[in-house]
Amino acid sequence: MGDAGATPGPPDDHTVSGGAGEPGLELILEEVESVVEPLGESAAFGPAAGIAVAGGPLVPMPPDEVAPGLVSSDNTVKAGLASAGPVAIAGVVVNVAGALLVVAVARLVTSRSYGEIAQLVGLFFILSMPGSAVLVGVVRRVTELQASGQAYLVRKWVARVHRICLVAIGVELVVVLALQSWIARWLGLPNGHGVVLILMAAGIWILLSVDRGLLQAHRSYRSLAANLMVEGGIRTACVLVTVAGGMGVGGYALGIFVSELVATAHAHWLANRAWADPATAPVVGGGGTRPPEELLARRRLLADVSAAFVGLALLGLLQNIDVILLGRLNHAHVGPYAAISVASKGLVFGALALGAYLLPEATIRWNEGGHAIRQLGVTLLFLAVPSVALLGIAVFVPRPFLTLVFSARLATAAAAFAPLVLAMMCLSFTVLATNYLFGTGSRWIVLLLVGGSGLAVVLVTLADGRPGATAWADLIVQALLAFGMGAAFLAIHIRHRGQHWSKRFGWQRLPAR
């Protein structure tokens, strides 16, 4: 169990010890800690001792020494529920609002237009997921700066990231304007209405991810939840107004674009407020060459972001490849399939929202030498109830449910509802496991996502646009991928605990001869 401000790194391979047969000092301290730790765990469930703040909850008294900008960890289930609660509640509210929006839009547009909207939304999520890779990089870099006592570098580093993102958005705009007609033809869309707006919204997501990453690194989960609510509320209002006004597919894309703009501005304001601590203010240095440690940190950050960029893009592909390929192969059935797709993929959106809590928790606790298994358990607990409820509906009353929610004309793919719900339950676990393992710096899990994505493209293509066959193909892929992620999770933690046990009992590697 490492100190809160310790520099990230694996446990030592050897232990300082006395003479033969004598326990080392580090082993003695470990044994004392194992006796004292349960007292801290039991005290955590008692009344909090803190300072009452008007209009807010009790603020716990800080530990004696905490690195500037670094929030201390509480590794109890109760603390995990309290931290994840606001994000989970916001995710539920936004998903409910999204479900109501889906119902309203389905009744305002034709079946064909509804399928086109589903394709554009799928494209948005595929292209916005790499923006989430920036979020992973922000969380990992900022937590490293906090842990090393260099929180004063955070603002300067983030300002540079913002400038790079703005340039990238400008380049994206030029490319999208040049390729919008080709993209529309490839998707089988009748025109390019909404393509530019939906792709630019995905680009703006990059900026939004930077500031949400700052909120996560600061563990400002209530602010993060408020930002999720703002994004969902603006999206619901704008889409309803534009689609009801007769703008159709283009109106839907405009609503998404406006909601991302507003959410980005709001997140930027929240992040600036969260990091207003003078301890994080930039310090003017004397210039000169960067030290080797900083260059090493930058290379490590680039590797983390690159892996997350690929991995999260593949998660977006896995979430939407079925509806995109079905729309391309059999456009007449994309509307009914989009109905079961939207209904079942609410689980994945919930997992993505909870991943916003799990990623920084895993990153910070792993850097401290611990783990976030309890926090993962909390997120799975939050997902379990809606998953079981939706699966029950999909198994026992699929057609009445789809008819009630979407209308009879979009209920013809009811037989594919249950396998698709099971597939999305598996993908939800994969999303959470990916966020967790990226937090531990396990970049190699991208290989699992590459294999799963390739298999998904092959099997969904072989389904030839049939809704039932497409859903079962998706289930096979997602189940195999979830199993692989679970195995990777166990392997990483067995290895991690093995290093801890080696250190705890004074085992050491024999020197090479």
Task: Tell me what each language-model feature is.
Residues 45, 58-64, 76-136, 306-329:
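Signature of the first transmembrane helix
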Residues 62, 159-187, 237, 241, ...:
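Alpha-helical transmembrane segments of multi-pass membrane transport and lipid-handling proteins
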Residues 79-94, 98, 120, 132-181, ...:
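Membrane-water interface segments that mark the loop-to-transmembrane alpha-helix transition
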